[in-house]
């Protein structure tokens, strides 16, 4: 047997590993909402509320990372003016009235309040399915109460997927960190206080409620059998096809800077079998902070041809992340082929595209399209 070329744990560069973990977590955080409370500013007195601030949930499956820094540890390291109040436990839906009122009072007296909310690990086990999409009631109640007394209320979410957020319109800002690994604490601190720009984008739609999801009518099924009857209408395709309002759409993510799109164009207005078409767009950082924009390209079938199983309104086909300094602009280029406008036909056992008109949609998210370009295709089978 050949000797392993992998370094032993003792030989690994832990400093480099940790730096990479922090950077990955920074780029994974998604700023879902921001009415101005973020970024926090030096000198502000900020109440940190919620046990996840001190005991971060950074992964699933009983992880054992060699070092995990909490948001509180990172704030102390950077000399932030914070006061920590537990408010609610991380592992139970349990309300302690005295602790609840102490958290509300601290939030009201502060310049801003950051509530670290999320699901306990027992709610997201691989061996069991979630029965609902709610946060623990003790968390929802405290968020609502704090938002009523503190206009600069920020919620940081630690979950592995979407949750219902009934308080979303009442808080100033929402930052979703998901389960961002051992670099979670430092990354959360950097994003909250503006040392880094949020550049993550949602990999899924966040619905308003469980009843809006495509699986609601079929789950949990009959015994050990669950039918997946949504067909091609998976994820954002379901919500777009029904023109349903959602909490936050697929691909969404805000920034502390701004981006302007201009000059979107195709190098040809017709795509032929075996050919390619190039889509271009120029993106400019119009703000005062370095950031990274994720440019997304969707394809919509506008041929009107009948489609067995249903036609999805649009489908993501390309995306590119572009780092930009303030005032910098860069051209983003995508190359498209007939595969990108095609669907698989079980009857023909082939990828097919109806002849006619397609729309190339370029934008910031699935529901923030900045340019629509027309493209013709002339063949029915690849």
Regions found by a protein language model. Give the residues of each.
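C-terminal non-catalytic regions of proteins with extracellular/luminal or membrane-system context
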Residues: 1-382
């Amino acid at each position: 047997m050949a000797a392993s070329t992998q370094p032993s744990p003792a030989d690994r560069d832990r400093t480099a590993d940790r730096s990479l973990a922090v950077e990955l977590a920074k780029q994974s955080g998604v700023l879902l909402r921001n009415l101005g409370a973020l970024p926090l500013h030096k000198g502000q007195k900020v109440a940190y509320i919620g046990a996840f601030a001190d005991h971060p949930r950074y992964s699933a499956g009983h992880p054992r990372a060699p070092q995990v820094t909490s948001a509180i540890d990172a704030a102390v390291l950077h000399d932030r003016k914070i006061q920590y109040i537990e408010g609610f436990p991380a592992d139970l839906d349990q309300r302690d009235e005295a602790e609840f009122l102490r958290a509300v009072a601290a939030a009201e007296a502060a310049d801003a309040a950051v509530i670290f909310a999320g699901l306990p690990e027992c709610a997201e086990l691989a061996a069991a399915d979630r029965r609902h999409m709610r946060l623990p009631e003790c968390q929802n109640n405290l968020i609502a109460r704090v938002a009523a007394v503190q206009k600069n209320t920020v919620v940081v979410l630690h979950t592995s997927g979407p949750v219902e957020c009934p308080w979303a319109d009442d808080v100033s800002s929402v930052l979703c960190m998901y389960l961002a690994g051992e670099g979670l604490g430092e990354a959360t601190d950097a994003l909250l206080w503006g040392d880094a720009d949020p550049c993550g984008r949602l990999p899924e739609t966040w619905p308003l409620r469980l009843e809006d999801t495509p699986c609601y009518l079929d789950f949990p099924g009959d015994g050990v059998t669950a039918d997946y009857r949504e067909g091609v209408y998976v994820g954002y395709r379901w919500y777009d096809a029904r023109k349903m309002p959602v909490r936050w759409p697929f691909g969404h993510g805000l920034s502390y800077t701004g981006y302007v799109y201009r000059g979107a164009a195709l190098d040809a207005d017709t795509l032929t079998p075996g050919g390619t078409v190039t889509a271009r767009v120029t993106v400019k950082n119009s703000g005062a902070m370095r950031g990274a924009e994720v440019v997304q390209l969707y394809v919509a079938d506008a041929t009107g041809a009948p489609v067995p199983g249903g036609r999805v309104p649009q489908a993501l086909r390309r995306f590119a992340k572009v780092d930009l300094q303030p005032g910098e602009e860069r051209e983003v280029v995508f190359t498209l082929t007939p595969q990108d406008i095609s669907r698989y036909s079980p009857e023909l056992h082939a990828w097919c595209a109806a002849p006619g008109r397609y729309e190339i949609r370029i934008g910031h998210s699935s529901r923030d399209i900045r340019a629509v370009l027309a493209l013709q295709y002339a063949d029915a089978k690849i």
